[in-house]
Amino acid sequence: MNKNVVIKSLATLTILTSVAGIGTTLVEEVQQTAKAENNVTKIKDTNIFPYTGVVAFNSATGFVVGKNTILTNKHVSKNYKVGDRITAHPNSDKSNGGIYSIKKIINYPGKEDVSVIKVEEHAIERGPKGFNFNDNVTPFKYAAGAKAGDRIKVIGYPHPYKNKYVLHESTGPVMSVEGSSIVYSAHTESGNSGSPVLNSNNELVGIHFASDVKNDDNRNAYGVYFTPEIKRFIAENIDK
């Protein structure tokens, strides 16, 4: 573990699903010594990459990994069922990439908070490029890896109702990578669950799932780092 992350006393983390969905918390023994960054940008045009790779749930975020296939957290997908809807890269009430029905949910069998969701290819409500899901979105590619000190960005829909589904991008440094865990100093909020964690080349490093509840300069965020095993699971469950 990175020397800037010190195991000390109990600090509460929050699973970052909007209060409009679930209000779950978990406990972790972590205290940070580095100051968190608060570099957050509102995205004005969601019809360009990498923003075309992001989707919105009612209370959380997801992102595209292949044909008709998106990724989010287990704690998000457990509140959805076949027939429920997602919206591709909405930009408040200005535009979106179409609205699509969920057709299958597949949870990662390990402890990691990862869930694959397949959607119907034909939109309920069309996007700017027609009714086909794959014409309106852009799948992300994987990064070769990540290490402490690398710059990352988290793109998602914090407080989606309050912010009227405006997409936000938050940036900061990686604090540590250990096994399937990645810790980073980027500002995230409720609703960011399921957001992609990207490197400076907009390549996938992991998926965001939680951050410290405390709102101060030592606040860190937490994601699932994409190990070869997790990448294999995702690849095996992408729509053919």
Curated annotation (Swiss-Prot):
Record Gene3D superfamilies: Trypsin-like serine proteases (2.40.10.10)
Subcellular location: Secreted
One GO term describing the cellular component: extracellular region
Signal peptide: 1-36
Catalytic residues in the record: H75 (charge relay system), D113 (charge relay system), S193 (charge relay system)
EC number assigned by the record: 3.4.21.-
GO BP annotation list: proteolysis
S-S bonds: none
InterPro entries: Peptidase_S1_PA (IPR009003), Peptidase_S1_PA_chymotrypsin (IPR043504), Peptidase_S1B (IPR008256), Peptidase_S1B_tx (IPR008353), Trypsin_dom (IPR001254), V8_his_AS (IPR028301)
Molecular function GO terms recorded: serine-type endopeptidase activity
Enzyme class (EC, first level): hydrolase
UniProt xrefs under Pfam families: Trypsin (PF00089)
Keyword Hydrolase: yes
Keywords attached to this entry: Hydrolase, Protease, Secreted, Serine protease, Signal
Family in the record: Belongs to the peptidase S1B family.
Task of the protein: Serine protease that cleaves specifically after the sequence Trp-Glu-Leu-Gln.
PANTHER family tied to this protein: PROTEASE DO-LIKE 5, CHLOROPLASTIC, SERINE ENDOPROTEASE DEGS
Name listed for the protein in its UniProt record: Serine protease SplB
Biological classification of the source: Bacteria, Bacillati, Bacillota, Bacilli, Bacillales
